[in-house]
């Protein structure tokens, strides 16, 4: 199986398109780590977990990356690159229903500037 995937990432959302299935998914560009276990969530699930008090949410990931910043979650510092990697991996998993990374033939990622336009 050969998959072609496009991702669009900005501070507010991540969208993914799987060409073969004409599948488009979009989610808020946030990650949340569950307090009890080392489980991570993205998008609306992440917001629900954080609002219930059961998770720690991080947002504005591209801005964090641009500043070279880190986010401390459950007493552990994560780089913006690590958090964005979690976000992208989770979106790819959702798009491909957990298919192996070897099945991805092409992956194109468009990043929107973290700066606000005037």
Write out the residue ranges for each language-model feature.
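Short glycine-aspartate micro-motif
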Residues: 2-9, 108
């Amino acid at each position: 199986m050969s998959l072609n995937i496009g991702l669009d990432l900005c501070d507010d959302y991540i969208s993914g398109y799987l060409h073969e299935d004409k599948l488009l998914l979009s989610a808020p560009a946030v990650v949340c780590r569950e307090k009890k276990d080392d489980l991570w969530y993205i998008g609306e699930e992440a917001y629900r977990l954080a609002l219930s008090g059961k998770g720690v949410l991080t947002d504005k990931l591209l801005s964090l990356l641009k500043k070279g910043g880190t986010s401390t979650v459950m007493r552990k510092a994560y780089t913006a690159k690590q958090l964005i990697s979690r976000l992208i991996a989770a979106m790819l998993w959702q798009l491909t229903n957990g298919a192996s990374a070897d099945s991805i033939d092409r992956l194109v990622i468009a990043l929107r500037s973290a700066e606000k336009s005037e």
